[in-house]
């Protein structure tokens, strides 16, 4: 005789579906060494649409005492806002955001350098991008003392940190660039272009 599955009774007297029961059982097996609070935190992390008490994030939360929330409470009515994003993004997302930030900085610096090289353009034409320093900065509060920011040496520079010469020389030695005249593979194409005329003989 086939057995029929019944919905399991919830602790609060309600019923849960078999799928939710299986998820709870799986979480309890996977995180058996965690306390009740920790399991709720894991559930919230795994299912961001569910609050700690099991209610949907965009619905009316259930209360353990059965009373409704106060009238002035922002959770009394269903929220029409989209759910907020996770406060702890994944490492892939962090890396992507960092690359995007660096790429936008690089594109901005390249556009500024191109605008500086082409000059002001035609008289009726708007300037595509302003220079890095648009107005002098006042240092110390006195209107007479004016100094540019530390990183405003050149608009083509992305990072204005000084490079340590020892580190740079160790990279040159490590990459073998100090033996550039001895390595013919670094001079490929010299028949097509006259590179030797461009560089001083001491290099």
From Swiss-Prot:
Q: Which GO terms describe its biological process?
A: apoptotic process; brain development; labyrinthine layer development; melanin biosynthetic process; melanocyte differentiation; negative regulation of DNA-templated transcription; negative regulation of neuron apoptotic process; negative regulation of osteoblast differentiation
Question: Recorded GO terms, molecular function?
Answer: chromatin binding; co-SMAD binding; LBD domain binding; protein homodimerization activity; transcription coactivator activity
What is known about its induction? Up-regulated by parathyroid hormone, forskolin and phorbol ester in osteoblasts.
Give me the Gene Ontology terms describing cellular component: cytoplasm; cytosol; nucleus
How would you describe the post-translational modification of this protein? Phosphorylated. Phosphorylation changes in a cell cycle-dependent manner and reduces its transcriptional cofactor activity.
The yes or no answer to whether the keyword Lipid metabolism is present is no
- Bias kind Low complexity: ranges: 61-84
Q: Which keywords belong to this entry?
A: Activator, Apoptosis, Cytoplasm, Developmental protein, Differentiation, Nucleus, Phosphoprotein, Transcription, Transcription regulation
Q: Which domain of life is it from?
A: Eukaryota
Q: Where in the cell is it found?
A: Nucleus; Cytoplasm
Give the motif span (Nuclear export signal).
168-177
Q: In which tissues is it expressed?
A: Expressed in calvarial osteoblasts. Expressed in nulliparous mammary epithelial cells; absent in pregnant mice and in lacting mammary glands. Also expressed in mammary tumors (at protein level). Expressed only in melanocytes and testis. Expressed at high levels in the strongly pigmented melanoma cells but at low levels in the weakly pigmented cells.
* Functional note: Transcriptional coactivator of the p300/CBP-mediated transcription complex. Enhances SMAD-mediated transcription by strengthening the functional link between the DNA-binding SMAD transcription factors and the p300/CBP transcription coactivator complex. Stimulates estrogen-dependent transactivation activity mediated by estrogen receptors signaling; stabilizes the interaction of estrogen receptor ESR1 and histone acetyltransferase EP300. Positively regulates TGF-beta signaling through its association with the SMAD/p300/CBP-mediated transcriptional coactivator complex.
Query: Matching PANTHER family, A to Z?
Result: CBP_P300-INTERACTING TRANSACTIVATOR 1, MELANOCYTE SPECIFIC GENE RELATED CITED
By sequence similarity, the record places it as follows: Belongs to the CITED family.
Subunit structure, as described in the record: Homodimer. Binds to RBM14. Interacts (via N-terminus) with HSPA8; the interaction suppresses the association of CITED1 with p300/CBP and SMAD-mediated transcription transactivation. Interacts (via C-terminus) with TOX3 (via HGM box); the interaction increases estrogen-response element (ERE)-dependent transcription and protection against cell death. Interacts with ESR1; the interaction occurs in a estrogen-dependent manner. Interacts (unphosphorylated form preferentially and via C-terminus) with EP300. Interacts (via C-terminus) with CREBBP. Interacts with EGR2.
Q: What is this protein called?
A: Cbp/p300-interacting transactivator 1
Q: Which organism is it from?
A: Mus musculus
Q: Which gene encodes it?
A: Cited1
């Amino acid at each position: 005789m086939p057995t029929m599955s019944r919905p399991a009774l919830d602790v609060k007297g309600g019923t849960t579906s078999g799928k939710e029961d299986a998820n709870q059982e799986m979480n309890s097996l996977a995180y058996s060494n965690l306390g009740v609070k920790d399991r709720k935190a894991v559930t919230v992390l795994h299912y961001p649409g569910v609050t700690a008490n099991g209610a949907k994030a965009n619905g009316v939360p259930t209360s353990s005492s059965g009373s409704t929330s106060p009238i002035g409470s922002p959770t009394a009515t269903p929220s029409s806002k989209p759910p907020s994003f996770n406060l702890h993004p994944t490492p892939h997302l962090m890396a992507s955001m960092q690359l995007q930030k660096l790429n936008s900085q690089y594109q901005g610096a390249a556009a500024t350098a191109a605008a500086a090289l082409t000059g002001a353009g035609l008289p009726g034409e708007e300037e595509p991008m302003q220079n890095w320093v648009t107005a002098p900065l006042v240092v110390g509060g006195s209107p007479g003392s004016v100094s540019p920011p530390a990183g405003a040496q050149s608009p083509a520079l992305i990072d204005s940190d000084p490079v340590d010469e020892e580190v740079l020389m160790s990279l040159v030695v490590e990459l073998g660039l100090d033996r550039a005249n001895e390595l013919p593979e670094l001079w490929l194409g010299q028949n097509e272009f006259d590179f030797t005329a461009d560089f001083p003989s001491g290099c």
